Structure formats: structure tokens, C-alpha cells
A protein has these predicted regions:
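Short, contiguous acidic/charged loop-to-helix segments that flank catalytic cores in large enzymes
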Residues: 28, 287-309, 334-342, 363-369, ...
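Conserved Class I SAM-dependent methyltransferase catalytic core
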Residues: 17, 24, 33-46, 239, ...
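Accessory, often C-terminal, charged low-complexity segments
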Residues: 282-304, 311, 344, 349-352, ...
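Extended hydrophobic-aromatic, low-complexity segments
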Residues: 285-289, 329-330, 339-343, 359, ...
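Conserved S-adenosyl-L-methionine
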Residues: 174-278, 283-293, 298-302, 333-334, ...
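Hydrophobic alpha-helical scaffolding
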Residues: 129, 149, 203, 231-235, ...
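Active-site lining segments that contact anionic ligands and/or coordinate catalytic metals
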Residues: 272-273, 309-311, 325-331, 356-357, ...
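Non-catalytic, mostly N-terminal accessory regions of nucleic-acid modification and defense proteins
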Residues: 1-195, 254-267, 361-364, 382, ...
């Protein structure tokens, strides 16, 4: 009897193959450590491949005399790798019992040989994890298959982005805070358009805001060299992830001397940024002591943000860093829109100072780490009428000083990964199109308030509503009850009620019959 043909194997992507290989670490490494194990190895492979390509180019152009000259690598932003740091050496020893120590040594020597990587790579990490040698070797084999030189398909970016998102997804709520979904970062970049100047993120996580901003500039044929990047990150392991993420993509950034708390150890005290993008921790409690940071210059002109919640501490930190024409896009939990007490006083002052440009409520389930509803705030230091040239395009901004644009995106988004959703390119284009039309001259022809989607509110309207920034207090929502055909609805209810009464009579008759047959007739 002929053997039945086996079902064809489902092809899996390179990213999926790597994820499966990383998942083999289960039992040897805590899931929360996967990202550090995998991404550090991936960085090592990438750095080595780039080094070998540069070494070959130097040899062909100048001869063997200069192949070990560090300057010939640095001029092209290539990290110089001592022999024991090269991927070929790691793979030659992949099955050895001391491979973890060799990986640690490789990373240590790379960092020492390249000052730009100071503080970026894990220190004595693999030896401390005691990973099963066979599982580590299997992971090395998978990473070895990657062609990191495939620039056309952005292999570097694809793998790094995929892993960061998968790790955040796997870790779920309460963890993975370092990752902001790409569609949200893209929306912020497309709204504030960081083409030229200083870009700052006060809580930069793994650097996603920077990466997508550079992609935005590239996609619009801008010059990445015109954008200077500054960031700060509190968690040391995430700080290292960010440095690696940016280094892999050839993005230069000033992330401060160390991982540090933005509030108590500001690494960029005198910075004035043209663009700020941020996704601060939501509703962070006890972010300062009762008597701490009382006279901090970042609060000048405002109340001191309460210790119970850092939301307005983040807002005022951002405001203090904006340049004369600076614009910021950042995310906060919805509670910040309507908090009372000190927060209300600060919010009112922000509105009176003409800083709030747009408030955009996002759909639920965009984030892997929380299911709470989130708001995108756009602040603008200069809402006056002016003409500017951005990336070769002349824009004529109208005066928007006593106006705020409210948008509600809760009906947008498409299913993505389990129960999550994402804002599609079409969704984002609709949102940014409305926002940019509203900002510019001639908006009377290009912008209009749309029920359940957007509304341009005056200062007086906002003041009348007690300076709340909840979009639903301004955007018109259709009362669907008004659209009901009363006669048709009543006839439907009449029919349903008749059916229920008939069924009730039948049930009563059946019950009386049963009792009568048992000899216990019920007289009504």
C-alpha cells in the first residue's frame, strides 16, 4: 500500500525560526531574560559581520598593512573587533563547555575597544546564567544563519524589531514597558515630523522612538544627519538594549553617562529640544519624596506635581525641555485628562499658556503591557501664525493659540497578534491628514468637525467645561435612539411580548395538567 503523502511543512520566517530557537532556552533561562540573551548575541553577529566586510575592503584597497588599524574602521562607523570577539571564533567554540565565558569575554573586549559602546554591552552575563551548553549552541547555530549584510530587506531592523515586540508580547502586563508598539510610534512621528533639529525622549526604553523617527525621515527623503538624538533611560538593562539597538542601525545618540532617573538625575539639564517623543510609565506612584524636588526649575510657573502620580511631572519635564518652536508628542493614561487638585491647576496653566495643541484618545488593546485606555498629547511651544520650510515643503501655519483639536480613535484599528489591535497605515494617514489640515491656513476648506471623530474647541469652551481635556466632552456623539423608527420598534416589541405571553400560558397549562395527573388538582 502506497504511503500517504505527508502534509507539506509550513514555512516559517527567519524571525519565527529565531524565536523558536530562543524558546528552547526554556528551563535554562527565565523568560524575562530571553531578550538579553538573544539580542546581545545578535549584536555580536552583526558587529562581527560588519567588521569582516570592512576588513576585506581595507585589505583590497590598502593591503594587509592597515587591516588592524582601528581608525580605518571608526571612520565608517564600524566597530573594531579583537580576534577573540569575532563571530568566527565564537562559532569555532560553540560546543565547548566554556562557551558562555568566551561570549562574555568577546562582549567585554568589544566594549573596551570601542568607547562609543561604553555601558552598552552586558558584563559577565552569560557565565552567570549557567545556560545549558547544547541549548546555547543551538541558538548560536540559528543566529549564524542570518545574513546581516542584507541591507535591501533590512534584516538587522527586522530581527531586532521582531524580537523586541515578541518579548513585550510574551511578558505581557506589568512587564515589557520598554517597548512601544511601532504603529503608535509611527503615528507620533508622522504628527510632529522630526525632520531637522534635536529629538529627545526622557524615558527612551529600547530606543523605538528614535528608530522609527529615523525611518520616517528616510521615508520622506530627509537627511538623518540633521537630527541629533538625546535620551535617558532609568533601567540599566534597558539602557544597554537601547544602545545596542541604535548601534545596530548606525544611529548616533547621547543617552547620558549612565542609566538614571530622569527626575532625580537629569542627564540633559540644559537641553532644549525641537521635538520630544515619549511613552512615560503610566500613573507612576511615589516618584519623588514628600520634600524632594520642591524647587526644581522644571516646575517654574506651575504647581509642584504631586507625589501620588508622576503624570504631570513628566508633562512639566517635557515642557521645560521644549525649544522656542518645539513640539512634543507623548502618551499618558486617560486619567491625566481630568484629574482634580494640583493636576487641574497645572493643566489649566498649560491650556492658558497655549501649549496644548491636540488631545487624541487611542483605541484600547494597542499595548502589550496594559489594556487601559491611553491618550496621545501634542504640545506646541509656538501656536502662532508662521511660515516654515520643512524637508523642502513650505507650510503656512495659522494662529491656533486659543484652540485645541480633540480626536477620538477608539473606532479605528485592525486585529493584530492575539487580542491586540494596531493602527493601520490608512488609519494613521486619516488622523495626520486631519491634524495637519487643521493646523494650516485655509483650514476652513480642508478641515471640519466630524461627529464621533474630531472637534476643534475654543479656549472659552474648554474653560466652560472646567479645563477638562476628555475628548468626549467636546466631540459630538450621535444619539442613535433619535434615529429609531418608533412605530417599527413598537411593533417588534409587541410581537415579542405576545410570543412570551403565549409561551407563559402554555407553560401554566402544562403545569396544571401535571399536578392534576398526580391527584393534586389546583383550583384557580
Amino acid at each position: 500500500m502506497a504511503r500517504a503523502a505527508s502534509a507539506p511543512k509550513k514555512e516559517i520566517s527567519m524571525e519565527e525560526a529565531l524565536w523558536k530557537s530562543a524558546d528552547k532556552l526554556r528551563g535554562s533561562v527565565e523568560p524575562a531574560e530571553y531578550k538579553h540573551v538573544v539580542l546581545s548575541l545578535f549584536f555580536l553577529k552583526f558587529a562581527s559581520d560588519k567588521f569582516e566586510a570592512q576588513r576585506k575592503a581595507i585589505s583590497e584597497k590598502y593591503g594587509e598593512k592597515f587591516v588592524d588599524n582601528v581608525a580605518f574602521y571608526a571612520k565608517d562607523n564600524v566597530f573594531f573587533l579583537p580576534e577573540i570577539s569575532r563571530w568566527s571564533f565564537i562559532m569555532e567554540n560553540a560546543k565547548q563547555d566554556d562557551i558562555a565565558l568566551k561570549i562574555d569575554t568577546a562582549l567585554y573586549t568589544i566594549e573596551k575597544a570601542n568607547p562609543a559602546l561604553k555601558g552598552a554591552l552586558p558584563d559577565n552575563y552569560y557565565s552567570r546564567l549557567h545556560i545549558d551548553t547544547a541549548k546555547l549552541a543551538s541558538l548560536l547555530d540559528e543566529i549564524d544563519k542570518i545574513n546581516t549584510g542584507d541591507k535591501e530587506n533590512d534584516i538587522i531592523g527586522r530581527v531586532y524589531e521582531y524580537f523586541l515586540s515578541k518579548f513585550a508580547l510574551a511578558e505581557g502586563k506589568g512587564k515589557g514597558e520598554f517597548y512601544t508598539p511601532k504603529c503608535i510610534v509611527n503615528l507620533i512621528a508622522e504628527m510632529i515630523e522630526p525632520y531637522d533639529g534635536i529629538l529627545y525622549d526622557p524615558c527612551c526604553g529600547s530606543g523605538g522612538m528614535f528608530v522609527q523617527s529615523m525611518k520616517f525621515v528616510e521615508a520622506h527623503h530627509g537627511n538623518k544627519k540633521k537630527v541629533s538624538i538625546y535620551g535617558q533611560e532609568y533601567t540599566n538593562t534597558t539602557y544597554k538594549l537601547c544602545k545596542m539597538n541604535l548601534a545596530i542601525r548606525g544611529i548616533s545618540a547621547n543617552l547620558g553617562e549612565m542609566a538614571a532617573n530622569t527626575f532625580t538625575n537629569d542627564q540633559h539639564k540644559d537641553l532644549k529640544a525641537d521635538y520630544i517623543m515619549a511613552n512615560p510609565p503610566f500613573n507612576q506612584k511615589e516618584w519623588r519624596g514628600d520634600n524632594e524636588l520642591i524647587d526644581d526649575p522644571r516646575w517654574d510657573g506651575y504647581e509642584v506635581p504631586p507625589t501620588s502620580n508622576a503624570n504631570y511631572g513628566w508633562i512639566l519635564n517635557i515642557v521645560s525641555k521644549l525649544s522656542q518652536n518645539g513640539v512634543a508628542g507623548f502618551l499618558l493614561a486617560n486619567g491625566a485628562l481630568s484629574d482634580d487638585g494640583t493636576e487641574l491647576k497645572i493643566r489649566r496653566q498649560l491650556i492658558e499658556n497655549n501649549l496644548v495643541e491636540a488631545i487624541i484618545i487611542l483605541p484600547r488593546n494597542l499595548f502589550y503591557t496594559t489594556d487601559i485606555s491611553v491618550t496621545l498629547w501634542i504640545l506646541n511651544k509656538n501656536k502662532k501664525a508662521r511660515v516654515v520650510e520643512e524637508n523642502g515643503e513650505v507650510k503656512r501655519f495659522r494662529n491656533r493659540e486659543r484652540e485645541i483639536l480633540f480626536m477620538d480613535l477608539r473606532q479605528m484599528g485592525s486585529p493584530y497578534e492575539k487580542k491586540y489591535i494596531e493602527l493601520t497605515e490608512e488609519d494613521r494617514a486619516k488622523v495626520t491628514g486631519v491634524y495637519h489640515a487643521w493646523q494650516q491656513e485655509g483650514y476652513e476648506e480642508t478641515y471640519q468637525n466630524v461627529p464621533e471623530f474630531c472637534y476643534s474647541a475654543s479656549f472659552d469652551e474648554v474653560a466652560e467645561k472646567g479645563f477638562t481635556l476628555v475628548p468626549s466632552r467636546y466631540i459630538e456623539f450621535v444619539n442613535r435612539d433619535e434615529n429609531i423608527d418608533f412605530d417599527t420598534k413598537m411593533k417588534t416589541l409587541q410581537s415579542e411580548l405576545r410570543d412570551l405571553l403565549v409561551a407563559e400560558e402554555k407553560s401554566k397549562a402544562d403545569l396544571l395538567t401535571v399536578f392534576k395527573e398526580l391527584g393534586y388538582e389546583i383550583e384557580l
